[in-house]
Design a protein with these regions (language model features):
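Bacterial N-terminal signal peptides
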Residues: 7-17
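Eukaryote-biased intrinsically disordered, low-complexity acidic regions enriched in Ser/Thr/Pro
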Residues: 22-81, 93, 98
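C-terminal "exit" segments of structured domains
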Residues: 24-29, 236-237, 245, 260-333
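DG-centered beta-turn motif at the end of beta-strands
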Residues: 51, 77-80, 111, 164-178, ...
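Von Willebrand factor
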Residues: 68-123, 129-171, 177, 203-208, ...
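Extracytoplasmic/secreted cell-surface and envelope-processing proteins
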Residues: 84-87, 118-122, 177-182, 206-210, ...
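VWA/integrin I-like adhesion module and closely mimicked acidic/polar interface patches used
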Residues: 175-245, 249
């Protein structure tokens, strides 16, 4: 009888030890968190205790928050499809110039054309090489007229080991998958390589779609802490269905820059249109250059899962509307 009791006690101790070991093995991980104002500028001054995170109604421990404005690596994927209008091409050129003009010391850029000719340029501080790349004939190293998502997948490999703030900016009319590259493949590659994707769309963007069934992509759940529209963001139930979930699930954002409303004329001869194009590109550059590096300790789950993040109500009551951009999949403990 005594032997059975001792055996039972030993099992209890063993199970408790394993549970403690599993809990102690939960190491905090760094996650890029963008908090922006209604006009797309970074929201500063937040601390760890101001954030509230949950996974399946279980709290996510926020261990620390640091404002990160260090050097960035930015890959630009530019659609050069001959079907694009002249105004769309002019807008694309203007956005690339704005992104480059917003660079800080230490920032490096790379560029890859999609759907047409042009030269691939790997990460460099030579802005002239980036701005001239799309006017080059190119030599078809990636095949004839590679698609946007095909190009993104190749570009992800260029980053190598992840560095803080790694980002991809896609300037394109759409993100249609190809026979060899699916949206799920791209979403997984972005997650695995800790890369945020931002979009400057040259067409209409659907904002009620999803890359995978387990990824929620309604406007209220894609990193927008409030229902007030951020500048340039509108809810559409038609248009490209991949731009929105791929960007927002990675912790980024997409702006519909051109051709979103068929009733409207998008002319780059209009100074107001030019200013709008520049402003959206500048907002993306700002989101890339500054963010909060959040250290979180997820609950003990065996696989990645969706999580929610918000700012406590007291902060929201006394601040202008803010929006939270964050990777929507949290790794397991």
């Amino acid at each position: 009888m005594k032997y059975r009791i001792l055996t039972a006690l030993s099992m209890v101790v063993l199970v408790s030890s394993l549970a403690c070991a599993q809990q102690s093995a939960c190491k905090a991980t760094d996650i890029p968190i963008g908090v922006i104002t209604q006009n797309g500028d970074p929201f500063r001054g937040l601390a760890a205790e101001d954030f509230i995170g949950h996974v399946q109604k279980r709290p996510v421990a926020v261990k620390g928050v640091a404002f990160d404005d260090g050097p960035r690596r930015v890959l630009i994927v530019a659609d050069v499809n001959k079907k694009l209008s002249a105004d769309s091409r002019k807008a694309e050129d203007e956005m690339i110039k704005t992104l480059l003009a917003s660079a800080r010391p230490g920032d490096t850029f790379a560029i890859m054309p999609a759907h047409g000719p042009g030269e691939d340029v790997k990460f460099t501080e030579d802005h002239a090489a980036i701005s001239q790349a799309l006017s080059q004939p190119g030599d078809g190293k990636r095949g004839k007229d590679p698609g946007v998502l095909d190009t993104v997948m190749v570009g992800i490999e260029w980053f190598g080991p992840p560095q803080p703030g790694d980002s991809i900016v896609v300037i394109a009319a759409d993100m249609q998958p190809s026979h060899k590259t699916t949206t799920k493949m791209v979403a997984k590659a972005l997650y695995d390589n800790h890369i945020r994707m931002f979009g400057l769309a040259l067409g209409r963007v659907q904002t009620t779609s999803s890359v995978a069934s387990r990824m929620t992509t309604t406007a209220s759940s894609q990193g927008l802490a409030e229902v007030e529209p951020v500048v340039g963001v509108q809810v559409y139930d038609s248009g490209d269905e991949n731009f929105y979930p791929l960007t927002t699930n990675s912790g980024g954002l997409v702006f519909s820059v051109m051709n979103a409303d068929p009733r409207r004329t998008y002319s780059m001869s209009n100074p107001q249109m030019v200013q709008s194009v520049r402003q959206k590109a500048h907002s993306v550059a700002s989101m890339i250059s500054t963010y909060y590096r959040m250290k979180v300790e997820p609950p003990a789950f065996g696989k990645p899962g969706d999580w929610s993040l918000t700012v406590n109500e007291e902060i929201q009551k006394h601040s202008q509307p803010m929006f939270i951009l964050y990777p929507h999949e949290l790794g397991p403990c």
